[in-house]
Regions:
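Short glycine/serine/threonine-rich phosphate/pyrophosphate-binding segments
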Residues: 38, 94-101, 122
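Gly/Ser/Thr-rich beta-alpha loop segments that engage phosphate groups in nucleotides
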Residues: 62, 93-95, 130-131, 145
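Hydrophobic, well-ordered secondary-structure scaffolds
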Residues: 69-75, 92, 105, 120-124
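Short glycine-aspartate micro-motif
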Residues: 87-89, 93, 112
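ATP/NTP phosphate-donor binding region
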Residues: 1-86
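A glycine/threonine-rich phosphate-anchoring loop and its flanking beta-alpha core
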Residues: 101-159
Length: 159
């Protein structure tokens, strides 16, 4: 599988096109509390984000753990996610790592898209298929290599 990497400042239109082409039965946006508050308003013109079920996790690397992962899995279940659903991870490395791992493991694999909002996540965490969580005091102790269907990188978020 080849990962599609898109550089654009028209995130809304690009995301809408990618989701339309994927034709999922449901769309979920995973983000953290900071991105939910400060960044998602910049995507108010994105019909995909507006119509998606939002899953918000606590911010910070300390929350990239099995408890947050379990919360995401539960909300995916409660929201009716299936293997035909699509997860969009909008955030920094914590969100793209944890969201990607949730996608890789839920129902044995759900398609996902990463929209990194930090420079580090744009060049490292969101690209290359590294997903995972911290466990037992160790960083990225549990994880999988699972590439996102697409990574949308924009300097709009790197203010």
């Amino acid at each position: 599988m080849s990962q599609k990497i898109v550089f654009t400042n028209d995130i809304a239109a690009t995301l809408d096109t990618i989701v339309d082409e994927a034709a999922p039965n449901r769309v979920f946006v995973i983000t953290d509390v900071n991105v939910d508050y400060f960044v998602l308003s910049r995507l108010s013109d994105c019909k995909t984000v507006a119509g998606a079920t939002r899953i918000v996790i606590k911010s910070g690397d300390i929350n990239k753990n099995v408890d947050s992962l379990s919360q995401v899995w539960k909300q995916l279940c409660d929201g009716g996610a299936s293997r035909k659903s699509l997860i969009i991870n909008i955030g920094g490395g914590v969100v793209t790592d944890l969201g990607g791992f949730a996608a890789a493991t839920f129902k044995r694999g759900v398609r996902f898209v990463n929209v990194p909002t930090t420079l580090l996540s744009a060049v490292d965490a969101a690209v290359g298929g590294k997903t995972g969580i911290n466990f037992n005091g160790f960083k990225n102790e549990v994880g999988a290599f699972c590439e996102a269907d697409a990574v949308i990188i924009s300097t709009r978020f790197l203010d």
